[in-house]
């Protein structure tokens, strides 16, 4: 038994790591902080990467955050749901954390994981086109706000 969060997808990843290690493929292990975490309740809670507090401990005053209220998201309005997306980044640097709460927010963790693990800059994500209406747009809009180009920010 490996200590840490007992998540099926974490165990699956660790199993692949062991198999590749045995095969001599020299795999690298994903840091636990970069493994997506989702609590399937109502509303759902999803997170990957550093919290704002963890980022401030590492990067100090260089940390930038944005909270995007899902009230500004068309699909969330259609679904009559609410919640927030929070992105944590380093000024002039990558996004280091994604956090969200709201109905179906666990479905957004994939893009959040890509942003964090690929060290995407807010401007990189802001330049991507997100389908409308989709809750996924909220990640793009949060990145736009973090990049200094807010579109529909409702705080």
Give the residues covered by each predicted segment.
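Rossmann-like dinucleotide/flavin-binding elements
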Residues: 1-33, 93, 134
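Short beta-strand and adjoining strand-loop segment in the mid-core
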Residues: 1-7, 38-45
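Flexible, glycine-rich terminal cap/loop adjacent to redox cofactors
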Residues: 23-24, 28, 40-51, 56-155
